[in-house]
């Protein structure tokens, strides 16, 4: 790290502002007017004027201060030492470190220095400097070479970058050349008025002094843009702290952006409590009997991390006296299969007697000798699905409770037979009418044929 010039000895005219420096070079042009629109600029831009003749350089500063200081280490203050440390305090409003003093870009003093402008900004400045506000590609090359000598010895790839920016960037558009103009091959390029302001803002935000070391990104030069953000403004440029940098002993948190989001630590105790809460809510839903498919709304923030499916909302908790625990995904089909097996093992009368029980008998749960043989009564399944069976009875016919074979062999009731007979009779009646109509049409067709044949003869 080289010697540092104190801020008190620093020259006042370290650079020129956008509205003053560039406007002197492009006096009376639209480019200078565009840059003078905003007066809130707090950073200078380089002086890119290249005038002929000898000129006294006013940018150089007297170096007598360097000889006055015997011990250079004493000139390093606390702010300089803190700029080296990776652990920073972004809330400290300390001034910028003099270690990274803002030296203006001067093409005359250091022609081999790369200009800190993007190619879109270079194209924008070249087009805005032209009187007609439109230039061909070769004139853009000439303008860049004239004002930035760095590109004279630079690799030829920068011309490809200029062409790519012209063709791919929406800020530039191709215009037709006039007949009076003789520009040779190529097209004219101009600035799209819709995106002109974007280019001006990009030019104003361009850092005119690139950081010499990566420490510039970690130096404390001002508070963050918003609380908890990783961006901070330094020397008029928006910089970002590296994600790996630890600040104040912890990584950067964006609580300022998302005030409602807060980290919830998940511990084994919390997971156990969540499981207990879910079991309790399941039992409460069993007692209150909510409608099927209704969403579960909880005001407890601990229960926000629990989820309930449509199947679990219809589940019922097993009674303590039952031998087996039924899963939440049990449906009416499982009940029918279970009933079929019970009827095959026992007698048909036992199952029908179980279906014919009244509600008081089901509530009292007094097992009869026939119920003792029933598998539903033994497993406690009936006590678990009382209300489901009650609703199923209203929409079931007696034949639904029988096995599949007996449903096929069972005769339909008399009312169904009468309806089927009436339907068959109506169909036969319609078929008879249609056959009669067909016979009549056939007879008429034959008669007409015979008449035609006799007429021909």
UniProtKB/Swiss-Prot annotation:
Keywords (A to Z) from UniProt: Cell cycle, DNA-binding, Nucleus, Phosphoprotein, Repressor, Transcription, Transcription regulation
Record-level GO cellular component terms: nucleus
Pfam families assigned: Forkhead
Region (Disordered): 1-24, 86-109, 285-422
Compositional bias ranges of the Basic and acidic residues kind: 354-376
InterPro entries per UniProt: FH_FOXN3, Fork_head_dom, FOXN2/3-like, TF_fork_head_CS_1, TF_fork_head_CS_2, WH-like_DNA-bd_sf, WH_DNA-bd_sf
DNA-binding region: 114-210
PROSITE patterns per UniProt: FORK_HEAD_1 (PS00657), FORK_HEAD_2 (PS00658), FORK_HEAD_3 (PS50039)
Composition bias, Basic residues: 384-396
Domain of life: Eukaryota
Quaternary assembly: Interacts through its C-terminus with the C-terminus of SNW1/SKIP.
Protein name: Forkhead box protein N3
Organism lineage string: Eukaryota, Metazoa, Chordata, Craniata, Vertebrata
Gene: Foxn3
């Amino acid at each position: 790290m080289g010697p540092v010039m104190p801020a008190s000895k620093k020259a006042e005219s370290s650079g020129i502002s956008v509205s003053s420096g560039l406007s002197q070079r492009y006096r009376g042009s639209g480019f200078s007017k565009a840059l003078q629109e905003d007066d809130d600029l707090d950073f200078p831009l380089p002086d890119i004027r290249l005038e002929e003749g000898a000129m006294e350089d006013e940018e150089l500063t007297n170096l007598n201060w360097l000889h006055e200081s015997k011990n250079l280490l004493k000139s390093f203050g606390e702010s300089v030492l803190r700029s080296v440390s990776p652990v920073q305090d972004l809330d400290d409003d300390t001034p910028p470190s003099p270690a990274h003093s803002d030296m203006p870009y001067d093409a005359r003093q250091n022609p081999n220095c790369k200009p800190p402008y993007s190619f879109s900004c270079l194209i924008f400045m070249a087009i805005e400097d032209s009187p007609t506000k439109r230039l061909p590609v070769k004139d853009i090359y000439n303008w860049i070479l004239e004002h930035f000598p760095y590109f004279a010895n630079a690799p030829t790839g920068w011309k490809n970058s200029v062409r790519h920016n012209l063709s791919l960037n929406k800020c530039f558009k191709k215009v037709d050349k006039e007949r009076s103009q003789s520009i040779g091959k190529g097209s004219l390029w101009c600035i799209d008025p819709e995106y002109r302001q974007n280019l001006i803002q990009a030019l104003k935000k361009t850092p005119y002094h690139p950081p010499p070391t990566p420490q510039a990104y970690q130096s404390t030069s001002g508070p963050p843009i918003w609380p908890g953000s990783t961006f901070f403004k330094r020397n008029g440029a928006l910089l970002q702290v590296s994600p790996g940098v630890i600040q104040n002993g912890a990584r950067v948190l964006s609580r300022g952006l998302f005030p409602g989001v807060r980290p919830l630590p998940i511990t084994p105790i919390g997971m156990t409590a969540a499981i207990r809460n879910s079991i309790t809510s399941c039992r409460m839903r069993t007692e209150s009997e909510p409608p099927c498919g209704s969403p579960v709304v909880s005001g407890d923030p601990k229960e926000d991390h629990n989820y309930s499916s449509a199947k679990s909302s219809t589940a019922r908790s097993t009674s303590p006296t039952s031998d087996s625990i039924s899963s939440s995904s049990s449906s009416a089909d499982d009940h029918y299969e279970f009933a079929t097996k019970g009827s095959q093992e026992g007698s048909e009368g036992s199952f029908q007697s179980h279906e014919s029980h009244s509600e008081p008998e089901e509530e009292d749960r007094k097992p009869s000798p026939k119920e003792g043989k029933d598998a539903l009564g033994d497993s406690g399944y009936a006590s678990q699905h009382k209300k489901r069976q009650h609703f199923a009875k209203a929409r079931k016919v007696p034949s639904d409770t029988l096995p599949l074979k007996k449903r096929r062999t069972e005769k339909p009731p008399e009312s169904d037979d009468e309806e089927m007979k009436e339907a068959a009779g109506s169909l036969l009646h319609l078929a008879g009418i249609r056959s009669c109509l067909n016979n009549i049409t056939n007879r008429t067709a034959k008669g007409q044929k015979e008449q035609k044949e006799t007429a021909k003869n």
